[in-house]
Amino acid sequence: MLKPLGDRVIVEVVEEEEQTVGGIVLANNAKQKPQTGKVVAVGEGALTPEGKRLPMAVKVGDTVLYDKYAGSEVKYEGQDYLVLHEKDIMAIA
């Protein structure tokens, strides 16, 4: 598994539904980037100028909401992940 550094978090992408509630099937280009994911790895936290580690607010297993343009997409062992800074996470569900 990937090990994030600093205040980074690795999130497993949760795909959006391909069909709307009304039954309309969305084309791939009509779907927006997913905004929900499951935390699979957490860094040790950011360092302060004094060298102290700031604790992370999220933990492995949390479901998080993030901005649709946040993070860097990576593919690792056939699975899609996002690498986010903790500040890019808007909420824990």
Swiss-Prot record:
PROSITE patterns: CHAPERONINS_CPN10. SUPFAM superfamilies: GroES-like (SSF50129). GO terms for cellular component: cytoplasm. This is Co-chaperonin GroES. One of its GO terms (biological process) is chaperone cofactor-dependent protein refolding. It is found in: Cytoplasm. InterPro entries: Chaperonin_GroES, Chaperonin_GroES_sf, Chaprnonin_Cpn10_CS, GroES-like_sf. CDD domains: cpn10. Keywords: Chaperone, Cytoplasm. Heptamer of 7 subunits arranged in a ring. Interacts with the chaperonin GroEL. Belongs to the GroES chaperonin family. Together with the chaperonin GroEL, plays an essential role in assisting protein folding. The GroEL-GroES system forms a nano-cage that allows encapsulation of the non-native substrate proteins and provides a physical environment optimized to promote and accelerate protein folding. GroES binds to the apical surface of the GroEL ring, thereby capping the opening of the GroEL channel. SMART domains: Cpn10 (SM00883). Disulfide bonds: none annotated. GO terms for molecular function: ATP binding; metal ion binding; protein folding chaperone; protein-folding chaperone binding; unfolded protein binding.
